[in-house]
Amino acid sequence: MRPVSVWQWSPWGLLLCLLCSSCLGSPSPSTGPEKKAGSQGLRFRLAGFPRKPYEGRVEIQRAGEWGTICDDDFTLQAAHILCRELGFTEATGWTHSAKYGPGTGRIWLDNLSCSGTEQSVTECASRGWGNSDCTHDEDAGVICKDQRLPGFSDSNVIEVEHHLQVEEVRIRPAVGWGRRPLPVTEGLVEVRLPDGWSQVCDKGWSAHNSHVVCGMLGFPSEKRVNAAFYRLLAQRQQHSFGLHGVACVGTEAHLSLCSLEFYRANDTARCPGGGPAVVSCVPGPVYAASSGQKKQQQSKPQGEARVRLKGGAHPGEGRVEVLKASTWGTVCDRKWDLHAASVVCRELGFGSAREALSGARMGQGMGAIHLSEVRCSGQELSLWKCPHKNITAEDCSHSQDAGVRCNLPYTGAETRIRLSGGRSQHEGRVEVQIGGPGPLRWGLICGDDWGTLEAMVACRQLGLGYANHGLQETWYWDSGNITEVVMSGVRCTGTELSLDQCAHHGTHITCKRTGTRFTAGVICSETASDLLLHSALVQETAYIEDRPLHMLYCAAEENCLASSARSANWPYGHRRLLRFSSQIHNLGRADFRPKAGRHSWVWHECHGHYHSMDIFTHYDILTPNGTKVAEGHKASFCLEDTECQEDVSKRYECANFGEQGITVGCWDLYRHDIDCQWIDITDVKPGNYILQVVINPNFEVAESDFTNNAMKCNCKYDGHRIWVHNCHIGDAFSEEANRRFERYPGQTSNQII
């Protein structure tokens, strides 16, 4: 039975409610029945998994029937009221989209609106009891402060046994504890109960049970174990059993969802004739090498669609994108649940899903939305095998992009890195633990060439989210007792799981600037921006202009022309310019702000405003083999919110020395007709080329994803006209489609597939 905790209104609460009702007058006819029912004894409980005793899905019993609350319009104020109904002092947070699993039965309340001062949930506005257009995929939950209300009566808790739940699962190696490489893939199953760790009786244990346990531990699949060996070993050891009768279907994301039984305190004969349950898990490709197992070559069927995660700070989390007709697209969050999320996680080589995310929690995608209303049983090998609805334009928007957080194997990587000297746990000087001859020791990292990509890996290894800044100097932070530099020349691609996977100098430490003043530091953040260029607009607005030199003095002053313009016969003649508009969207979860402070912004007389970034975008003309033949020379940029999505307000503007940046949900538009919004192609010969635009090319400002910062188009130039087509974000196509793009022979069709 699932763990629940139940409280009922105390007689004093009932008396207080009646007194308040007499003071305030009779309730209106439309809300009267609900308040009356509440005053006569609503019951509340927390349910779901995995959870602690002070958090969970909120369930209310009314007229003898249990039901849930929809998350529409749910706020922290409503959570405060519900936590007090449950006997806690206040709420510290709330959850949506059935984070603790979907409930059953009625959905009692929808559009619940509380001010936070109400004495009861019945005093909050809502659509009325039982009036809802939600599904249980939208069940709300609360996270209460672990502090009880003084004098609150909790004598109506159902039974003590119902508080029992499997809080955590681990594998304990039967032999060689502490000597095996991480992650541990085989051993005895142990579950953490309120009174400590216990083993599980293996009577009736099945492969389905192992599948669920391995999924919780971050492994996509399981394999058979040497039962005879473990049976012999069990006879020589003492055991502490706390759980038996486990019967999983195999699709559960958590052991708490399986049918299981807890031993009672007075049970003396535990697991008669049985032994401790044992599992052997198969790690995914990312973790196979570190666990000492060889990577298994998993052959995919011909034509099988692929899946990827984008925008996540950690491995195994992100926005779900699937490949259809050689183009990547997102998944609508309608009907999105843990079963579908677990299929994605296992397909990618991780365990089951820890969380099914909705509402573009991992940022919005751009382009196609391929799937909607995905309904998986949990047994499918690919998301495309699940029943789903063909998407139409009016069905979904990118504000509903689905995401996942997967269970990952424990590797201990976070124990080999730490921060010191910072003002908070999210910032500080980076210290790493290294081995070698002698004992393990902590040391610093040389700040030379340390940047955003290296900081991304450090923050990921620390478990602190995204990188906000990578710092080459840390003299302004408190100095610690660690002074030795043990790592230098660190160069990361940004995708590594830990710093020791990045290229570095090894044991030969080379640091140009010595001393702890110039060691590497980071500032991490839970959110980050994500910039994308609207590629279709580039294709629609591209054209050639022969602009007279006497109109280009300001552009020449800002170095926006090719070098050959210096020897031109000014003010006579002209320059041939490829002009286009660029619309840069921030689809992340944090505003994009320039790295430089206001004190260092540069005034540009030609434009009449300050520029906050020297290098924000590169414009290039490339040959098919990647050789650059022309480039845009825009000296610097001003960042502002030109337009925003509905219900998003502009925050940044260039005029009047305003704050600069791009708000989440807004975009900065550089129109084709402004100075320097071009590439000087005067010296380019006729032929087939690639137009490339790269945003934030030097990674000066941190983002959640840099792989979508480049846009490419095919160009055919005949010396008089130019055709620009096939414009797309750099990672929007499959690898095969991108290879065909690079081999572009010069056709004028807009289709490359």
From Swiss-Prot:
It catalyses: L-lysyl-[protein] + O2 + H2O = (S)-2-amino-6-oxohexanoyl-[protein] + H2O2 + NH4(+); N(6)-acetyl-L-lysyl-[protein] + O2 + H2O = acetamide + (S)-2-amino-6-oxohexanoyl-[protein] + H2O2. One of its GO terms (biological process) is negative regulation of DNA-templated transcription. Its main location: secreted. Residues 44-145, 169-282, 307-407, 417-525 form the SRCR domain. The keyword GTP-binding does not apply. Glycans are attached at residues 111, 266, 390, 481, 625. This is Lysyl oxidase homolog 3. It comes from Homo sapiens (Human). The gene is LOXL3.
